Amino acid sequence: MLNIYDYTLEELKRRLHPPFRAKQLYHWLYHRYEEEFEKMHNLSKEIRQKLTQDYSATLTKVVREEVSEDGSRKYLFQTHDGLTYEAVLLKMKEKKEDEEGRIVEGEKYTICVSSQVGCKVGCSFCFTAKGGFVRNLSAGEIVYQIVALKRLNALAPEKRVNIVYMGMGEPLDNFENLIQAIRILSELDGLSISTKRQTISTSGIAPKIEKLGALDLGVQLAISLHAVDDELRTRLIPMNKAYNIASIIEAVRRFPIDSRKRVMFEYLVIKGVNDDEKSAKTLLKLLNGIKSKVNLIYFNPHEGSEFERPLESKMVAFQKYLTDRGLLCTIRESKGIDISAACGQLREKIIKEENCGNR
């Protein structure tokens, strides 16, 4: 059985005849969020039968939802082969102008999606790394995270959302399926999520950053840097042995960036590890000449971790050092702490519950 969400509109046009039926199917999948082919009444009976026979829109399903006090929602998905992965919906307030020029408060949504079941990178601070790598998600398994979260939260197809490939897994390690998912999500007759609203967060596979840049898709780039010297970064991210800081920075310098955008450098701040002024000074020098923004992230403690959450005063001082010298720097607002929103934590929680139940 084939996953219907694996295909672009053009690919479905080649599979369905006449081709205009593919556009109708896309409307049902991505505008009506319909998963049962038999309910797609403007498709012929013959096409509905073919779709039911050869394809499925329900190979992946949501098996758990947790809601945070701050409005964040975390979902656990289960694949056809019994594997689980996660996605998170973040709801934030924003101020914008209405048609009469008045400033009004609204809401914006960001969906944090997974690209793999588990991860190969093995970051020492990451909860997902504890479970190792299982397999890549297909393009359809990536796409379905957005479809499901929009449907479950009654978000209209035209409601703009931002997508960050920052959940379980290293997106650039699943390159072909990632690119296919981006193309499906940005399809004008589908969800129509502009590539400018899609951010790929990578631990820094330098050759894949170059390859992504060569495609010039218009996506945004975020680098999980977390350290400013190779010795510490290798301790935190073992993959740094293969792709050191210099190679990553060089690849970023060649990456095509929209004139109104910046490369995001994510910096997970860990108490007593990388929260000092010397690190801030080195980071400033490292990013010199790059149109960039630094996003400071509080380390989110989890069971068994050797690291601790930094002091707020240290975060503020780090930010001030950078901003005082002209580097745009923000402190990420913590979301979903009460529901263990860090990637991999809900999956691990469910596995533990199941193991306890089987004793």
Curated annotation (Swiss-Prot):
Cofactor: [4Fe-4S] cluster
Residues covered by the Radical SAM core domain: 105-338
CDD domains per the UniProt record, alphabetical: Radical_SAM
Cofactor binding, per record: Binds 1 [4Fe-4S] cluster. The cluster is coordinated with 3 cysteines and an exchangeable S-adenosyl-L-methionine.
First-tier enzyme category under EC: transferase
CC annotations in GO: cytoplasm
Disulfide bonds, paired cysteine numbers: C112-C343
Binding site residues for S-adenosyl-L-methionine: G169, E170, S201, S224, L225, H226, N300
E.C. designation(s): 2.1.1.192
HAMAP family: RNA_methyltr_RlmN
Any further remark recorded for this protein: Reaction proceeds by a ping-pong mechanism involving intermediate methylation of a conserved cysteine residue.
The protein's name: Dual-specificity RNA methyltransferase RlmN
Protein's organism: Wolinella succinogenes (strain ATCC 29543 / DSM 1740 / CCUG 13145 / JCM 31913 / LMG 7466 / NCTC 11488 / FDC 602W) (Vibrio succinogenes)
Organism taxonomic ancestry: Bacteria, Pseudomonadati, Campylobacterota, Epsilonproteobacteria, Campylobacterales
